Amino acid sequence: MKYTLAFACSQDGFIAKHSKDNPFEWTSEEDQNHFRTLISENEWQVMGRTTHELNPNHNRKRIVFSRQYKEIELIKKDIPDQFYFNPDLHQMSDFEKICSGNILILGGTSVHDFFIYAELVDTIHITIEPHTFNGGVRAFSYINFKDYKPYFLSKNYSYEEKTLNNNGSILISFNKNS
């Protein structure tokens, strides 16, 4: 099982202007193509409830983190591979009983925090888009944007950077070294 975390952010480090902001409205075509590739490479997606509600898709296998549910349960009875999961009440072994294969972690902040803190993430893809939000939703509650690179390098990740387009979109990838 491989865990990949992916998100886009503004050049000042925010993944959204506010909690209901949909990144598909401001991310580049190149980032959206990269995102579609990641979706095709990963069997399951993990996200918070707000992220799921912004972009529902009944055809994708999803685990939706939500503290509103005491039991692991189907989001909708007629969709067999989408579950609510409360990370405060259930163990990773419960999570891994549901999922098999590669997992794409999509956010938001508390979901990112959960997997980074648990040191489960193998690969991190961050697209930095040439927008400035001057505030909003952070990718991590305890890692500042300017500290991403030193933080992940200190956690034994390698670093790669790639220019995506002429507008200034940059893809940064961190890969966990064995």
PLM segments and residue spans:
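Enzymes that bind and transform nitrogen-containing heteroaromatic metabolites
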Residues: 1-178
